[in-house]
Amino acid sequence: MKVLITGFDPFGGESINPALEAVKMIPENIEGAQVIKLEIPTVFRKSLEKIEEKIEEINPDVVISIGQAGGRFGVTPERVAINMDDARIEDNEGNQPIDISIYEDGESAYFSNLPIKAMVKEMVDNGIPASVSNTAGTFVCNHVMYGVLYLVNKKYKNIRAGFIHVPYIPTQVVNKPNTPSMSINDIAKGLELSIKAIVLNDNDIKTVGGAVC
């Protein structure tokens, strides 16, 4: 099995992106799966283009994209991505699409086909705070998750794909009072455990993972 895992470069005035740094730290072989790492730009369209180029090059079985979600307390596999770009801030090339569909011929939303609840269970069972997230936002993270799942739906039907958001690391919250963070080692461990769960689970487990609101 080949797993392509991507991480964004820093954005929004940050000098580091824990998503990318954690991706760099994970092993290149997990439960017999080959792990291929890719840095992508925090830029609308270009991020997707780079991922599709890599898909064409290596023909992966799984594509997992990792992004930073400052303010979250744990590692959060995403359930769904929506067909909407609505950028609160500019991306790294100054683009700021507002209320624009990602793909005009795409569905309103695409759901991850990764075993997200099994991933959460694997992390929690090993001491990593984790939960299912039901929104990937409307910035480049959602753009990438939706775009990859669109490509899976249209062209690469044998690929399993999804997205994981990770918290800030401690150095990022020094001047952000009351903002949660997680060590880069724990984030990397969470990603490793998530890949383990993907390798070991063709189908997701049935367990509570929803939210009231």
From Swiss-Prot:
Reactions catalysed: Release of an N-terminal pyroglutamyl group from a polypeptide, the second amino acid generally not being Pro
Gene3D superfamilies: Peptidase C15, pyroglutamyl peptidase I-like
Pfam family, one: Peptidase_C15
Keyword Metal-binding set for record: no
MF terms (GO), sorted A to Z: pyroglutamyl-peptidase activity
Catalytic residues identified in the record: 78, 141, 165
Compartment list: Cytoplasm
GO CC annotations on file: cytosol
Major localisation: cytoplasm
This protein's record includes keyword Hydrolase: yes
GO biological process: proteolysis
EC number: 3.4.19.3
Function as written in the Swiss-Prot or TrEMBL entry: Removes 5-oxoproline from various penultimate amino acid residues except L-proline.
Listed NCBIfam families: PRK13197.1 (NF009676), pyro_pdase (TIGR00504)
Family per record: Belongs to the peptidase C15 family.
Protein name, per record: Pyrrolidone-carboxylate peptidase
Record organism: Clostridium perfringens (strain ATCC 13124 / DSM 756 / JCM 1290 / NCIMB 6125 / NCTC 8237 / Type A)
Gene: pcp
